[in-house]
Amino acid sequence: MTGLFNNPRRHLRTLIKQARKEKDPDVREKKYNEALEYGHGIEKKLEHDPDIAFIIGTIYYIKGDSEKTLEYMNKTLEIGIFDLDALAIKASVYLNLKNKDKVIECCDKIKELDPKNKSLLEIEDELKKI
């Protein structure tokens, strides 16, 4: 019965929600850092869980750390190669870095999996602007 209440993914998402609600930027940053600390603490135990890698990568994305975001999205895709959200975030990071080739590579993978994907259409529109 204790396993029912011990859900690390849920707790990590709760920490992120708390950070997102915070109005003070310094406190919000601190809460995101706390979420990262917790995420890294459970990462080894759940190393084959693509959700943990994805959530940690998303925190880095929110914080604007492109390198770490890509690292964790790549981990997510190593575990779950068909993760459309991870591919979309990777494409968005590469879009921000103005790396057209990598954006196109991610978009091509998304197209293979889901040609009508909403994120894909948005990313392709943004790609035309760079």
Predicted regions: what is each one?
Residues 17-85, 89:
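Alpha-helical adaptor scaffolds
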Residues 84, 88-95, 105:
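Extended alpha-helical scaffolding segments
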Residues 23-27, 119-128:
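Extended amphipathic alpha-helical coiled-coil/heptad-repeat regions
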Residues 3-6, 44, 78, 112:
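Structural signature of alpha-solenoid helical repeat scaffolds
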Residues 1-12, 38, 129-130:
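Eukaryotic alpha-helical solenoid repeat scaffolds
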Residues 62, 96, 126-130:
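Register position in tetratricopeptide repeats
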Residues 84-86, 113-124:
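Boundary/linker segments of alpha-helical solenoid repeat arrays
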